[in-house]
From Swiss-Prot:
The keyword Ligase applies. Pfam families: AMP-binding, AMP-binding_C. GO terms for biological process: carnitine metabolic process. Keywords: Ligase. The gene is caiC. The keyword Ligase applies. Pathway: Amine and polyamine metabolism; carnitine metabolism. This is Crotonobetaine/carnitine--CoA ligase. Its EC number is 6.2.1.48. Belongs to the ATP-dependent AMP-binding enzyme family.
Length: 518
């Protein structure tokens, strides 16, 4: 059975506009509190205007167009507008500076960029660099633009185009819709090639996983350039005719008030959001929400999980995946049995195994690499852009993907995440998980944030170093820190060194960028 058939993203939006028409599709709140709202038909019209503008400016099927934007409705106009004419969106992390952005532009040979005033200084020099492939800049601005070759005023020019699509490029669900670069926390990012089929199946899969309904209001503050916002929030919500509330920025002080304000029924969070929300003063109405599920990503310590559930009266729904899997293919479902700290079980379309370094399946309870099986270009990514070597290493011909995550499986088929392979420390013959140590250290009442890495050790392969951020106003001596560790973990897991810091470098999804600590 094929639930997608030939329905690419253009057909999806035309159908959504017809079926849901005036129902609210997107509510956007800026960092200043300004709210913009679009019905399904209005959003489709803006998508068509953007598509017409891009086509009029010479963008054709297969062209790579970079988007460097904070969360905003224009991201959605461009994302789906490009898809409607067969062009390929290349979202760029909004935190990236010149060198990081230029590397992606050069690597994928993007001739076009859509950006805002905030980021235009990154791209203006590229327009005049004869070695850069960039030839045209679409600038989202409320300022009057001076006439400059290669710069297009996106808002004013888009408004000149009709709300119906002018050009219907032949499309296939197998066409590339997006190249999404991985975070590159330990190495240069790789371009994950994502098809129309990938994005359509993400909508169906994640809406099934969350049991989404037409009357749901899904609030997200995850970056639109990230796979979570796209494939765990937006597309699932749209696949059932629900409403997306997109916030421009995360604010610990405002986040729970926004959940109450918009009467959100589903939201998603990373541990940093949960921790900072829990640090806010208790509000008498904070339990008067309508949240049915909170999608939870990455690792949350037991004490944090229990405290959040008790205080906020929420239910956490675990979802585990990566950009290459498109969705959180291992996870919990509403109403199903849950077994914390399990990350859940694989859903339909997928299989999962634990394998050793010889690529052989291991018995239940034994830690190894989590490998998952799907179909390339459909339920898994198609390939790494211009990296056949990396594709061959990660993706086997029969559809098994090596995730680089370590974990184990229990007798009932529940999977447990241990750590990323790059976060496993080899110490005196023992494999030590950074996350395990981090969770223990995070349980100290004076510690707000922590990261652990391995550092070279001539005798024991690697030593363990901890980077610790204290709760505001608290103090903790090195002696007290080591005493706590010695009391709460095996001797070989106790860090050899600690460094106290004001903050930790994190990427958009909350992962610590550990290469910046080494």
């Amino acid at each position: 059975m094929d639930v997608i058939g030939r329905q690419h993203l253009r057909q999806m939006w035309d159908d959504l506009a017809e079926v849901y028409d005036k129902k609210t599709a997107l509510i956007f709140e800026s960092a200043q509190g300004k709210v913009r709202q679009f019905s399904y038909s209005e959003l489709n019209e803006e998508i068509n205007r953007a598509a017409n503008l891009f086509h009029a400016c010479g963008i054709k099927k297969g062209d790579h167009v970079a988007l460097h934007l904070d969360n905003c409705p224009e991201f959605f106009f461009c994302w789906f507008g490009l898809a409607k004419i067969g062009a390929v969106m290349v979202p760029i992390n909004a935190r990236f500076m010149y060198e990081e952005s230029a590397w992606i532009i050069n690597h994928c040979q993007a001739h076009f960029v859509v950006t805002s005033d905030n980021f235009s200084p990154i791209y203006q020099p590229m327009l005049h660099d004869k070695h850069s492939p960039l030839t045209q800049l679409f600038l989202i601005t409320e300022n009057c633009l001076p006439t400059e070759q290669g710069v297009v005023d996106f808002l004013s020019e888009k408004a000149k185009h009709p709300v119906t699509l002018n050009h219907h490029t032949p499309l296939s669900v197998d066409d590339t819709a997006e190249i999404l670069f991985t975070s590159g926390t330990t190495s240069q990012p790789k371009g994950v090639v994502i098809t129309h089929y990938n994005l359509r199946i993400a909508g169906y899969y994640s809406s099934w996983q969350n049991a989404l309904r037409e009357d749901d209001i899904y609030l997200t503050v995850m970056p639109a350039f990230h796979i979570d916002c796209q494939c765990t929030a937006s597309l699932p919500a749209y696949s059932v005719g629900a409403t997306i509330v997109l916030l421009e920025k995360y604010s610990a002080r405002a986040s729970w008030k926004q959940i109450l304000k918009y009467q959100a029924t589903v939201t998603e969070c990373i541990p940093m959001m949960m921790r900072t929300s829990m640090a806010q003063p208790v509000s008498p109405d904070e339990k008067q929400h309508k949240l049915r599920e909170v999608m939870s990503y990455l690792n949350l310590a037991d004490k944090e999980k229990d405290a959040s559930i008790e205080r906020l009266n929420v239910r956490l729904l675990t979802s585990h995946g990566m950009t290459e899997t498109i969705v959180g293919l291992i996870g919990d479902r509403p109403g199903d049995k849950r077994r914390w700290p399990s990350i859940g079980r694989p859903g339909f379309c997928y299989q999962a195994q634990i394998r050793d370094k010889q690529n052989q399946q291991v018995p239940n309870g034994v830690v190894g690499e989590i490998c998952v099986k799907g179909e390339a270009g459909k339920t898994l990514f198609k390939e790494y852009y211009n990296r056949p070597d990396a594709t061959e290493k990660a993706l086997e011909p029969d559809g098994w993907l090596h995730t680089g995550d370590y974990g184990y499986r229990d007798d009932e088929g529940f999977f447990y995440f241990v750590d990323r392979s790059c976060n496993m420390i080899k110490r005196g013959g023992e494999n030590v998980s950074c996350i395990e140590i981090e969770n223990i250290i995070a349980s100290h009442p004076k510690i707000q944030d922590v990261a652990v890495i391995g550092v070279p050790d001539d005798i024991r392969d690697e030593a363990i170093k901890a980077f610790v951020v204290l709760v505001d106003g608290e103090t903790l001596s090195e002696e007290a820190f080591f005493a706590f560790c010695e009391q709460n973990m095996a001797k070989f897991k106790v860090p050899s060194a600690v460094e106290f810091k004001q903050g930790l470098p994190r990427n958009c999804s909350g992962k610590v960028i550990k290469k910046h600590l080494q």
